[in-house]
Structures are given as structure tokens and as C-alpha cells.
């Protein structure tokens, strides 16, 4: 990791110590074991939820390889540290982990930690999350703040059109990319929002301004959709 990325990571962590923290563990089911993996995740979520950790299980869709995300949410850095320590000494978790390790339903392919850019958001604010789309942006050197400001403008437009928006800066497991997450009540709601976006003069003007920039603040590197199949809050 080069020095500029390391500095950005440390800056994000220290400046957002009172913001919601999310941990995402991305799993690829073994052939014929998707149901087992989901069952194991639900058992894990029950253990974690009893500790006070909010958990979502998300099935990824278009733009992904159909993996399953196990998502843990914490109110802030203090809660993250406290609950991680609790998990480390949990007999229930240790016993469950040993059982799953002996007969896994899938393999962990990625894990990442993210920090919400909105300090007012709490871990239990995602109880009604159903369908989402994610846009991962890689900021140009020195342009992270410009990207964050662009996110704020886009979020204001999108929320006026009916979507909920959250944005995250990558922490441990990532570099300095940022994730723009749009949340909807259903797939039909997603379609309705997209239709409104296609005729929104404000959104089209914002897009055109970004497209015309000779030195864009960031590059879009990944997009995908998904839906929450289980929520433990």
C-alpha cells in the first residue's frame, strides 16, 4: 500500500470515529450448497444479533457473480471495538465457527470495512432495507473530497426522486474507493426511480457536467444490484 493511500485510510478512520461502520464478508457458495450457506449465515446472524450486532444477509444480483454478502453494522468505532472484543471471547461463536469450518457451505472471497459519511446514521437504521444498487468509485489522486461533494449533490437529487442514499469510504480491506449505495422498497420502486431519473432535468444536467469534465474527480469501477434476504436487527 503506497503512502498516499495509507494516509487517506487513516484520515477516514480517525475523522469518522462516530459514524456507522459496516463490515462486509462476501461468500461464494460451493456447488449445491447455497441453501446450507444461507442457513449457516442465519445461525451466525442470530449469535451476532444477541451480542447487539445488526446483521443483513444480501443476495447479490446483476453486476456480481451471484455471491452472498454477510453484513455486520455498528453504530460507531466505540461500538465496533466493544462488540468485536465480545465476539472474540464468545463460546457460542467459537462452537459455531468450529462446526462450520468442518463442513463449510462456501468460501470467503472478500472482506471489507466501510465508514458511513453521514454521522447521523445508526446501525439499526437499515431494518427496512430490501433492494439496493451499489456504485463503486475510485477517486483521482487528491480528489476524494471532490468525489464526496459530488456524492452529496447526487444524493440530494436521488432522494428527491424517491431513493434512499448512503455513501461509504473504504476502511480496512480497501483502498480509498467510495461506495454510493441507493436503497429502494422493491424492484418496482427501483424501476420507478430510474424512470424519474431519466426525465429529471437536474439529474441530466449533473451528469452532463461530470461527463464534460476534462479531469474527472473519479472513475466508476464497479456497479451491482442486490436484495436483502434476511435482516437481524
Residue ranges of predicted features:
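Short S/T/G/P-rich N-terminal loop/turn motif that feeds into the first structured element of a domain
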Residues: 18-233
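Sec-dependent N-terminal signal peptides
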Residues: 6-9
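N-terminal signal peptide c-region/cleavage motif recognized by signal peptidases
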Residues: 14-16
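Positively charged n-region of N-terminal signal peptides that target proteins for export
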Residues: 1-4
